[in-house]
UniProtKB/Swiss-Prot annotation:
<dbReference type="InterPro" id="IPR002180">
    <property type="entry name" value="LS/RS"/>
</dbReference>
<protein>
    <recommendedName>
        <fullName>6,7-dimethyl-8-ribityllumazine synthase</fullName>
        <ecNumber>2.5.1.78</ecNumber>
    </recommendedName>
</protein>
<feature type="active site" description="Proton donor">
    <location>
        <position position="83"/>
    </location>
</feature>
<feature type="binding site">
    <location>
        <begin position="49"/>
        <end position="51"/>
    </location>
    <ligand>
        <name>5-amino-6-(D-ribitylamino)uracil</name>
    </ligand>
</feature>
<dbReference type="GO" id="GO:0009231">
    <property type="term" value="P:riboflavin biosynthetic process"/>
</dbReference>
<dbReference type="GO" id="GO:0009349">
    <property type="term" value="C:riboflavin synthase complex"/>
</dbReference>
<feature type="binding site">
    <location>
        <position position="122"/>
    </location>
    <ligand>
        <name>(2S)-2-hydroxy-3-oxobutyl phosphate</name>
    </ligand>
</feature>
<keyword id="KW-0808">Transferase</keyword>
<comment type="similarity">
    <text>Belongs to the DMRL synthase family.</text>
</comment>
<feature type="binding site">
    <location>
        <position position="18"/>
    </location>
    <ligand>
        <name>5-amino-6-(D-ribitylamino)uracil</name>
    </ligand>
</feature>
<feature type="binding site">
    <location>
        <begin position="80"/>
        <end position="81"/>
    </location>
    <ligand>
        <name>(2S)-2-hydroxy-3-oxobutyl phosphate</name>
    </ligand>
</feature>
<comment type="function">
    <text>Catalyzes the formation of 6,7-dimethyl-8-ribityllumazine by condensation of 5-amino-6-(D-ribitylamino)uracil with 3,4-dihydroxy-2-butanone 4-phosphate. This is the penultimate step in the biosynthesis of riboflavin.</text>
</comment>
<feature type="binding site">
    <location>
        <position position="108"/>
    </location>
    <ligand>
        <name>5-amino-6-(D-ribitylamino)uracil</name>
    </ligand>
</feature>
<dbReference type="InterPro" id="IPR036467">
    <property type="entry name" value="LS/RS_sf"/>
</dbReference>
<dbReference type="InterPro" id="IPR034964">
    <property type="entry name" value="LS"/>
</dbReference>
<keyword id="KW-0686">Riboflavin biosynthesis</keyword>
<dbReference type="GO" id="GO:0000906">
    <property type="term" value="F:6,7-dimethyl-8-ribityllumazine synthase activity"/>
</dbReference>
Amino acid sequence: MTKEIHKKLHVLIVEARFYDGISDALLKGAVRTLQKAGASYDIVTVPGALEIPGAIAFAEKNSKVFYNGYVALGCVIRGETYHFEIVANDSCRALMDLTVHKHLAIGNGILTVEDEKQAWVRANQDEKNKGGFAAEAALCMIALKKRFGDNH
């Protein structure tokens, strides 16, 4: 992606703060990627991954601010109950529904992992940098929307 493609872009980062340290690492990666691309951004915080799609939907429908795209950041770590599957599947499905049915450019940076060690490897900028990857995905989807003539 070139900086020219991202000129004047404004992105909303929605971060779930269930795991504060991991959330911080994901956010740093996303912010750094958006800054390098020259995109401006706002950040809103929600309690957990299930609330991320709702926050994006609220922003899209009710916000007085126009967002070209969205970055979803969070972490779901498998526990001893079925709750992991519900949160992982439903948060991802809801983001896909927003992308497909509402034509939103969303980068999904919700980690779904077995343990905290896997989460840290994926969140750290000097390792997998999934926060940065989610921001880059959002920027790519914004560019793709523009390519197909959708400027909203």
